[in-house]
Each structure stands twice: as C-alpha cells, then as structure tokens.
Amino acid sequence: MTVDEFVKMDNSFNEGMFLTKVNNIFVKLLTAIMMDDLDSVRHFISDDVYKWAESIAKEARDNGHRQMYDELNVKESKIDSILEEPRQYVIKVYLQSRYLNYIINLSDGSMVSGNDHSRIQVNYNLIFTKRKATEKQGIARKCPGCGAPISVNTSGKCEYCDSIYNQEDYDWVITSLEKA
C-alpha cells in the first residue's frame, strides 16, 4: 500500500517523522555495537536484530577489539513498501549510510583492520513492524513497572525501578537489517 493509503488507516502516521526515527534508530544501533552497549537500544530492536548486533560486539570483545563506525551518518532513507499483515503492519525501508569502518585493538588503540581515513557507503534494507493493537505512544511514556515518566529515546530501562520498556508493545521496532 502507499503511504497515503496507510495514513488513512493510521492517521497518526507521519512519513517524515517515521524516517527520522528510522535514521536515529539506525545510528543508535551501530553506535551501540561500537560502544558494546546494546542495552541502550534493546527496546528499539527485535530479538533477531539483537542477536545479530550482539554477535558483532561479542566477536570484537572476545578478541580484545572494538568495531568502529566513525563519522556515521544516514545519507538517504525512503519507504519501499508498507504491508498489512493479520497482526501487524510492516514497513520496508531502504537506507543509505556512510561511515568509517575499521577495527581497533582495545589494549593499545592500534588499527587491526579496515580504513579509518575514507568513509564507505553501505546500503541497507530494514524492516520495521508495529503491532496493530498497540497502545498510544503517549501512554507508553510511563514505566510499566512503577508508573514513573521515562524517556524512550535514551534508554529502555526505567531509572527508578530498572523495569525494561518494551517498545514493540507501543511503536515501531526494527525486525530485520540486511545489507542491500
């Protein structure tokens, strides 16, 4: 279906705001891999994407390395398609990113592999899903554990009671990320 057709089904959907969210989640995800801090993005990603990201971070960590994605930015993102499934909506997004891609040794900071002088362009196909019976995003800004206000853009964990905020119950979650 087209974006206009989807807006008729979900009048709260805004293409520009959605793509801004996609770009931010993508940058946060690669930054979380680089910093070996996947908890900071756990609430934005599915279990499969978490496992993919964790495998990259774990391999680097186990070897005493760090995967670097320096000077990371999104050059372009666009909605390829929108599908309605029985229990969820699916939006496929094409994303063009640029970054320095290299690996460093954590003990001395030396470069192990890659290029820290020239950015590469990498294209991705991303899939975002949202449950049809989701609650409104405004309601989701309260911790499910204690009711305290939470900032879902910075962390998926309540700073008061440590409850984990599950974004898929309320909003779009990245469920697939593949190089195009």
Regions found by a protein language model. Give the residues of each.
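Surface-exposed, charged secondary-structure patches
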Residues: 63-108
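Intrinsically disordered, low-complexity segments
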Residues: 98-134, 170-180
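Short metal-coordination and nucleic-acid-contact micro-motifs, chiefly zinc-binding Cys/His arrays
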Residues: 136-139, 154
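Short hinge/gating elements
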Residues: 3-13, 108-115, 147
